Design a protein with these regions (language model features):
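Macromolecular interaction modules
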Residues: 1-203
Length: 203
């Protein structure tokens, strides 16, 4: 993820959009399974990623979700994705996890999927974070409770003009609802994607 192009979600009262430098995320190691039992068959690939992580990241935080807590959405635009951003959300104090999940998946993401020139929408809603879930060696895993993140949305755009128009014109309108459920939105531009395992084979 970009080390310089981040923190560009529109500002709103009560919403943290500037990412503290010591909490900035370098990248994402994302694993998506086709079936509920697929993780059992992928243990060898998971072990490879576990050992290799120190070569890529300085701090990693493993976020997991229940089955069906991740969604891929059909968008109104069928053009290929040229640019991607990832939005991380911190749940607002007092908001129940079920209400937050409904907002992310059925509210915000569903709206995003209908926007022209948005070519990709993917959501993940996380279980409570636990360091023991992914305690890779020689990589930092510190994650104070006040810094926890609870969901993410990956957005794809057809081109740079569409991306700029979204953040300038549409994203500010979404904040009226976002601030009811989230206390922070941290946005990063995804510079490149590097497959580690594809079709069960190490790249």
């Amino acid at each position: 993820m970009s080390a310089t192009e981040h923190s560009f979600w529109p500002k709103a009262t009560g919403l943290e959009t500037a990412i503290p430098e010591d909490r900035r995320i370098d990248g994402i190691a994302e694993v998506t399974y086709q079936k509920l039992l697929a993780p059992i068959g992928g243990r060898r690939q998971t072990a490879l990623a576990f050992e290799d992580e120190v070569n890529v990241f300085r701090r990693t935080l493993m976020h997991m979700g229940f089955p069906y807590s991740s969604r891929w959405y059909h968008t109104s635009t069928q053009a290929p994705t040229q640019l991607r951003d990832v939005l991380y959300f911190r749940r607002k104090d007092g908001v129940k996890s079920g209400s937050f999940k409904t907002f992310v998946q059925d509210g915000l993401a569903s709206q995003l999927a209908t926007i022209p020139e948005v070519t990709e929408v993917r959501t993940q809603v996380y279980l409570p974070w636990n360091k023991a879930t992914w305690n890779t060696p020689n990589v930092a895993h510190d994650n104070p409770k006040e810094d926890h993140l609870h969901a993410s949305i990956i957005l794809g755009f057809a081109d740079q003009a569409a991306r700029e128009a979204f953040y300038a014109n549409l994203a500010p309108q979404l904040n009226a609802e976002v601030v009811q459920y989230a206390s922070a939105v941290h946005v990063y531009h995804i510079e490149k994607t590097l497959p580690f395992v594809l079709d069960g084979k190490r790249m």
